[in-house]
């Protein structure tokens, strides 16, 4: 009987040591630093954007976190189509000037340092100004969908 208890105790101890080892493999237990020179910059395409837009992923979701971030640069006049984020979105303007607009409301000019918090379910668009490019960091959560809608027409786009 003692032998069974010793075997069970040993098995429990080995299991207890193994669990943290597996957890460490799923997420690094140290800080990571990524140089901007190593970011992959790519075109956002024209499926959901008007004008030239480029993106660079800063980081992806890593369990248990669901957050991810990217830089997005809009050339002058470039903008997103109207869209809705199921999980919401935060934008931090880092360069240039641009616009954001909730459906049915007046456009709001954006400048470096501005932080836009768009709650879940709010129909909106954002982009560069007519005369100047804009770069922002976009922060979102994985697991939610983005519902893309119609483009913002030249008539509805602010002319600075």
Range-by-range predicted roles:
Residues 22-66, 146-160:
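A short, N-terminal "cap"/entry segment at the start of jelly-roll beta-barrel domains
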Residues 80-82, 100-101, 123-129:
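Short beta-strand His + acidic residue motifs that chelate non-heme Fe in jelly-roll/DSBH
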Residues 15-22:
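C-terminal segment of classical bacterial N-terminal signal peptides
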Residues 1-9:
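Bacterial N-terminal signal peptides that target proteins for export
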Residues 131-150:
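A short hydrophobic beta-strand segment most commonly corresponding to one strand
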Residues 104-121:
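Short acidic-glycine-tyrosine-enriched beta hairpin
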Residues 71-75, 84-100, 139-141:
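Short, conserved beta-strand element in jelly-roll/cupin
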């Amino acid at each position: 009987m003692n032998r069974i208890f010793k075997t069970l105790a040993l098995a429990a101890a080995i299991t207890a040591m193994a669990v943290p080892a597996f957890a460490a493999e799923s997420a690094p237990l140290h800080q990571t630093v990524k140089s901007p020179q190593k970011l992959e910059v790519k075109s956002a395409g024209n499926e959901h954007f008007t004008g030239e837009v480029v993106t660079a992923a800063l980081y992806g979701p890593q369990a248990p976190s669901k957050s991810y971030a990217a830089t997005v640069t809009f050339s002058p006049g470039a903008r997103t189509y109207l869209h809705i984020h199921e999980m919401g979105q935060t934008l931090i303007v880092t360069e240039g000037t641009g616009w954001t607009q909730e459906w049915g409301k007046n456009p709001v000019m954006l400048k470096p340092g501005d932080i836009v918090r768009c709650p879940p379910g709010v129909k909106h668009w954002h982009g560069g100004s007519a005369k100047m490019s804009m770069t922002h960091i976009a922060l979102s959560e994985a697991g939610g969908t983005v519902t893309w809608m119609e483009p913002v027409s030249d008539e509805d786009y602010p002319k600075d």
